[in-house]
Amino acid sequence: MSLLIKNAKVVDGSGSPWYWGDVFVQDKEIKRIDRKIDDVKADRTIDAEGLVLTPGFVDIHAHTEGTIVFHPEMECDVTQGVTTDILGLCSYSPYPDKATYMETLTRNMARNVLWYRTHFANSPYDWHSLTEYAQVVMSRRPAINVMPLVGLASVIWKAGYKPQAETDARKMKPAEMAKAKDLIRQGFAEGAWGFSTTRDYNPNQYVDPDDVIEMLKVVAEYKRTWFPHTTHVCTPEGVREGIEWAKKAGVKLHIAHFNVIPNFSPGTVNTVYEALGIVDTARDQGMDVTFDVMTWFNYCYPPHTLMHNLRHLARVYPDKPPRGTQSVEEFRKAAQNPDYRNEIKNTIEQYIHRAAIRYGYFYREHLDSVILLNTSDERLEGKTLGQLAKERGGDPKDMYYDLCFETSPILKTSPNTIVIWPLTTGYPYEGNVLKALSHPLSVPSIDTPTYGVPVEEHFNSNTYGAFPRGYRVLVDHGVEMEEAIKKMTGYPARIVGLTDRGFVREGMKADLVIIDPVEFGPGNNLINATERAHGISYVIVNGKIVMDNGKLTQERPGEVLLRGQKSVPKA
């Protein structure tokens, strides 16, 4: 298919000023760019007068590695202009095989257990290498491109080190370390683009730091990028630790989902500013360090998942798991005992306090801003606990506990009730989003699975709106359009080592987006999280139109991009 885009205001992804131009696309590539192209015939011509042509957006932190198999249409990415996902973040990668991926992911992410096991249990999809995973994805014909990483959790688990509790923490045995290094090398040989880790999740939190650094030296050997989910999600201590480890290993560093929620109390330093200062110092000292930022920062907690998953219960209430209870029903029955219920309340308080110290969120004061959705009582729908407390004369904290235990007739909920903590709305954190996102070393990211999470689980607002919101936050606060587009295109492509996409240039792959620069922005919010972005007209992937004048075309021309190799052929 050939395509001619005429009369466009071209923003090329480099940060350079826009220019007027026509762009001719053929055989997946940008063949020609000129002020006017009138001497070629194309299968399709798009008049982009009044619109802006940009490279396709690159999401440097996606969690689409599992959901893409079942939802290859990837609507949430396409409708906000994303044409390439980097996947396998936070150490959970589909490499080296499906069984290891499932084992490590579901052991930690309790809320993912049911979805992944239900979908994969009876599916025909299986793989035993990165190459085979790529073939599985291509057999599903993805709408956009994906770029896989190697993950620490998957590597150490496959190597035989399977820590599940603090008592399992130890140095890896020489044979385990040798196997882990071989797995990393093999992943890179098969085309993985980098290495991801985390320090907050099982089993990664029990790995000895020196062992992580030893594995990072292999990443440096192959000149790949390290993508850490740092300790306590980018607290100053976590950022400092990541920088120190990167220096010791000599590896290029990209810090994942930089935390914009400060942990501060009156008279103390905003920890977001402190963490940014640590990054600046490292950069001044010559270190290659970058980071990404979620443009929405809210958390969604289905209470039925919180209370109905005993593994998650044991994690949330580590000091007082459900004593003697073998089922959720037994636990709920036991919770009717006031003494036991108060024990659980006190444990929750301790958990919230620890989380506030570590991460800077889950303050008790946030409870009055918690929003309820999918309730069985329409009088509760969309209201906050603060509003309900005011209406009914209760306390937001007690109402939250009543909701979890489902004992209050006021807050009697359906099994699918959702609790949202809107952590960048209504609190003085919005400025931190701007501060971090406008930083010269930052790029926006989504940090969620693609379209297809369970209906009963509310979408994180980033799922459909991270990039349009990031654009609006920047442009509406005086950042030049060209710089905002660069952060979503050419810059993340450079960070990950992608050389044939991210820019509107002759010879580059034709991943392109056409937007209305005034209207482009999020259509969603914390409650209506799945509303599509405004002001996006066309999305083109590998030269084919996947969104045509605002409508999805059902084209799925995406590819699995493997470093140093040609694209994986379609099945």
Predicted regions and their residues:
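Divalent metal-coordination and catalytic microenvironments
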Residues: 8, 23, 28, 50, ...
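Alpha-helical scaffold segments that flank or form the walls of functional sites
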Residues: 66-149, 172-190, 213-221
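C-terminal cap of metal-dependent C-N hydrolases
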Residues: 351-354, 434-441, 447-449, 459-461, ...
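Glycine-rich, proline-tolerant flexible connector loops at the mouths of alpha/beta enzymes
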Residues: 94-95, 197-207
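Histidine-rich, glycine-flanked metal-binding segment
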Residues: 1-3, 10-56
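Acidic, glycine-enriched loop/beta-strand segments at the rims
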Residues: 10-22, 415-427, 433, 480-485, ...
